[in-house]
């Protein structure tokens, strides 16, 4: 595989990053590692070698091979990539999201201890001493439990274990506002499925913009075939000689949304990274935005 990779020492342009409210430099597109199983290490190595600097994973053996992510990262570090060049984010997944046969922490422990154990497992898997972001994989049903988990994550932040915190799969604006109000360490990131059933999180994204919270999107292409097939997108693909995915990702990037891409195709990896090579006009962004 190495013969097909570009020189590993390549550095991303500063324009390819966005700065979070905690001063963390986040790539404008992130490589997602769910459902890659035994191919995880090779795909992560390939993604980083081609230019990705952001990697998303989770301490959830049900859907992620987190240790494989670590192996892919280490392979790139051996070839010259510094840890400081990478943005690594992982997640604490509550029991409800775990495979009962492969829980990566003591299911009988307190919530705080579950978070701590999961975090330490992530560090071991990823072979790192810190995370750039620790994300709560999904809200807990009970507000008290939610508070316990978030406080445990705050403890990790305050000890220097992670540079910022976030939450995923949180589609209820009032629930998110409550977390934001109660949190000592405010969420810097929210990562949600981006699709029409939630009206593309319009009001939630407005709140995020007001508070300086970075919105990350997943299932961005899979959930939106109608948008990708729309004449508005097709017209822009012809004008810029880009793929439909590139046009949509570029629109999101110019809207300060960081999309995740989980492609296993080298061609698509290169195309996804190339979204920084062109720019839509304000009118074009408005036209794409009307499709949401």
Predicted regions and their residues:
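Beta/alpha (TIM)-barrel catalytic core signal, keyed to glycine-rich beta->alpha loops juxtaposed to Asp/Glu
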Residues: 138-292
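Short, acidic/polar
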Residues: 36-48, 108-126, 173-177, 199-201
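Active-site groove signature of glycoside hydrolases
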Residues: 123-143
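A structural motif
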Residues: 52, 128-131, 162, 187
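N-terminal binding-site loop/beta-alpha segment at the start of enzyme catalytic domains
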Residues: 2-86, 90, 223
